[in-house]
Amino acid sequence: SCVYCGFHISNPMPRTILTEEEIVNEYKAIKKLAPFENLLLVTGENPAKAGVPYIARALDLAKPYFSNLKIEVMPLKTEEYAELKEHGMNGVICFQETYHKANYNIYHPRGMKSKFEWRVNGFDRMGQAGVHSIGMGVLIGLEKEWRTDITMMAYHLRYLQKHYWQTKYSVNFPRMRPSENGGFQPNVIM
């Protein structure tokens, strides 16, 4: 439950868990748009409804359509990342959001995402599982001192490169924009 996110659990918006048929229909629709080979599968942080078995099946269904499969899901256990690799996943994207631990807990007051150490150590679990490609990022605008977050991410990346040197890395710089409905406002606008 992220206080800044429009998808947070208390937002009364309709949510859908796609059936296998709907998943395949989405894949076909994407392929009709252009000859895409890269696919990023994204889920909410709900392991009961969109956990590892669901993600594994979605990966299996994607293989006939796409050659490069990445996921952006809740942080997983090492063995879960390894299992998803067996289903064709070759990359993971995870946003730490902020490295400021005290504020992290304010922005993520409950749920699995509220566990700072579990999230930040997820990158190690990806490396231990031999994930081919890891994408990481902080949410610029969440903290007033955004340069500190970027510096901490750079140190974290350097650590990962030393320990899991076989892995390829990418860095993402998503930024917050002002909310039009008067909700959470960024501390910095870039």
Per-region residue spans from a language model:
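Conserved C-terminal portion of the radical SAM core fold
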Residues: N38-L41, E117-G182, M190
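Short, acidic/polar
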Residues: E20-A29, P75-E83
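Glycine-rich tight-turn/loop motif centered on a GG-T
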Residues: S10-I17, A48-P53, Y104-F116, W146, ...
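Charged helix-capping and loop-helix junction motifs
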Residues: E22, V52-R57, I150-A154, V188-M190
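Radical SAM/AdoMet-radical enzyme domain recognition
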Residues: N38-L39, V52-I140
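Non-catalytic positions within long, well-ordered alpha-helices that form the structural scaffold/packing
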Residues: K31-A34, K85, G127, R158
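Canonical Radical SAM [4Fe-4S] cluster-binding loop centered on the CxxxCxxC motif
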Residues: S1-E22
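Short Fe-S-cluster ligation motifs
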Residues: N25-N46
